[in-house]
């Protein structure tokens, strides 16, 4: 059975100094979401992959909701052309709002902020607080070290084997979009396995 997907939260870098292959993947993902009329939810940044995925979704006829703390707006770090801009008070509120608005998460490569967002949403799913698909878009094998670390966590019993199904890995934007439709929704009762 296909999941009903109206919105997708995309985590990604704000850096402008990264390889063009990452920008290509971000634009392709934004285009696919826009063409399918899937609302893009992100952190409303006006630089890097965050801006690239937003601009591509908008060009393809999609809608973008950006969620950003007020202090970042005051710094002028927000994208001014989004369909909707939601200002919040803190980084914590930003992440919760993005999760609450989304039917799935796709993580593109990024730095500490992206990695922190991804690991937090994985943790929420482990605890049964987020039940929707989480897809890691492994452009240029960027996430291989993280995936190795997660496998090691399972191997050494810091996580259960069942927790390996919390996330799925895609190599292309097309595969990532297909996975958000086909990945089974998580069962909240899994939280009984949260502790080893």
Q: What residue ranges belong to the model's regions?
A:
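A cross-family phosphate/adenosyl-ligand binding-site feature
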Residues: 2-101, 140-179, 184-196
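Short loop/turn segments at connectors of secondary-structure elements within structured domains
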Residues: 4, 128-130
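Short beta->alpha connector loops at strand-helix junctions that form conserved
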Residues: 44, 68, 88-89, 108-110, ...
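Active-site/ligand-binding-proximal alpha/beta "capping" segment
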Residues: 93-128, 135, 186-192
């Amino acid at each position: 059975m296909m999941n009903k997907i109206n919105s997708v939260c995309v985590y990604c870098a704000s850096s402008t100094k990264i390889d063009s292959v990452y920008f290509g993947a971000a634009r392709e993902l934004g285009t696919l979401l826009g063409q399918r009329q899937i609302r893009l939810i992100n952190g409303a940044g006006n630089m890097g992959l965050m801006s690239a995925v937003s601009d591509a979704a908008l060009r393809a006829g999609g809608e973008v909701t950006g969620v950003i703390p007020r202090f970042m707006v005051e710094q002028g770090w927000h994208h001014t052309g989004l369909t909707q801009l939601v200002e919040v008070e803190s980084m914590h509120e930003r992440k919760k709002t993005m999760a609450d608005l989304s039917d799935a998460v796709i993580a593109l490569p990024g730095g500490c902020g992206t990695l922190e967002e991804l690991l937090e949403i994985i943790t929420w799913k482990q605890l049964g607080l987020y039940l929707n698909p989480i897809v890691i878009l492994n452009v240029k094998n960027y996430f291989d070290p993280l995936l190795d670390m997660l496998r090691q966590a399972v191997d050494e019993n810091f996580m259960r084997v069942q927790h390996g199904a919390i996330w799925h890995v895609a190599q292309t934007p097309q595969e990532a979009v297909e996975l958000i439709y086909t990945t089974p929704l998580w069962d909240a009762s899994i939280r009984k396995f949260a502790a080893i």
